[in-house]
Amino acid sequence: MSRMVGTVSRGVRAPIIRSGDDLVEIVTKSVLEAAAQPEDGFAIRDRDVVAMTEAIVARAQGNYASVDDIAADVKEKLGGETVGVIFPILSRNRFAVCLRGIAKGAKKIILMLSYPSDEVGNHLIDPDVMDEKGVDPYRDVLTLEKYRELFGYTVHPFTGVDYVAYYMDLIRDCGAEAEVIFANDAKAILPYTKNVINCDIHTRKRTKRRLIAAGAEKVFSLDEILTAPVNGSGYNENYGLLGTNKATEDTVKLFPRDCQSMVEAIQKKLYDATGKHVEVMVYGDGAFKDPVGKIWELADPVVSPAYTAGLEGTPNELKLKYLADNDFAGLNGEELRQAIKGRIAAKDGSSLVGNMVSEGTTPRRLTDLIGSLCDLTSGSGDKGTPIVYIQGYFDNYTTE
C-alpha cells in the first residue's frame, strides 16, 4: 500500500521548566519517552524536526530582568530627563512592565502612539470612524485632547482595556510626568524631545535612522536596552528588551540568548540515542495574522533565534495543481500520478523562483514556516506541550 500520511505535527508534554534546568536532557528525554508510548508513539526518522518554545529556553537560562534593572539602563543611556517613547505595541504582557522600567528611568515620558493601530494590528480606533472624522493618519499629529474629542474613550475589543489611559496611569504611578500624542511619522516626536526610545519591532532600524537624520540626539531601539547585565540581571546582547514577556508585575522574561549550542547539543544527543539525524530549533511567535481580529502574531524580533543547519533556506517546491491543470491536463488516474511523481523526482537543486510551475508556492524561510506551525501546535495557554515534534515536513508526493 502506498503511503497516505504526509506532515504530522505533535505537541510533546514536558515538565514545568525552572531556572537552571538542563534543557538538553529534558527535551531529549521527553521526545524519546513520547516516541516510546505504546498507543501513540512514533518512530524517529532522519529529518524529523524537534522544536521548543523560546519561553522554556529563557526560563531554563534564568533570563529575567526587573523594572529597576530596566530603569537603571534607561537612565544611563538617555540621561534620566525627558524621554520620548514611540510606537510601542498595545500589550500588558509584552510592553507594560518595560514601560514601567522606562518611566522609572526618566522624569517625563512623551508617549507617541501610532494610529489607528499599533505595529501588530491592535487597534486604538476604528479605521472607518477615523475616515468619517476626516483624520489623515499619514499627516495629522493629535494631542490627547483632540484624540478624546474625536474618538472618546475606546477600549481594545479583546482585552477591554483603554490603552491610552492605562499607559498614562502606569507612567504616573512610576513617578514620571506623562504626556501622549498620536502620530505615525517618527519625526513628530522631535519638537517634544531629542532623546527617544523607538519601540517598534520590525521597522526599528529605519525608524532609528530617520530620527537621527532629522536631528535626534540620543536614540535607542528596544533591542539596545539591556544588552548587557545590569546589577546581575538577565540580558540579550542581540535583542535587548525585544521579545520580552511579563513574568511578574515587576519582572520580565527576556528573549533567550546563546541558543545555538543548545540546539546542536540536542541534535547530537538524539543522534547518539537513535542513530537518526533530527533537526532542532527554538521558536517564538508564529508569523501569521488573524483574519478576524487583524492581529499579526509576530511580536518577537524573529520567529526562531536558533536552529540547526538543515533548517536553513526556503522551500523549493512544484505546484501540483498547476502540473495537473497544465502540463498533464490530458492525463488521469495512475498515469497522472506517475507523471507528476516523475516531474518532482526530476527536480534538481536549482531555485524554481520565477518558474511557472512554482507559482503559488511559499517562498518563505523554512524556520518561519515551521516556527508558525509549532506556535499553532503548542498554543499559548495550558496545553503543556512546549516541545513540538514534526515528521514528514521535507517529504513530497514521491516519498514512500
Language-model segments: residues:
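Conserved mixed alpha/beta catalytic, RNA-binding, or beta-rich assembly cores of soluble enzyme
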Residues: 2-46, 55-400
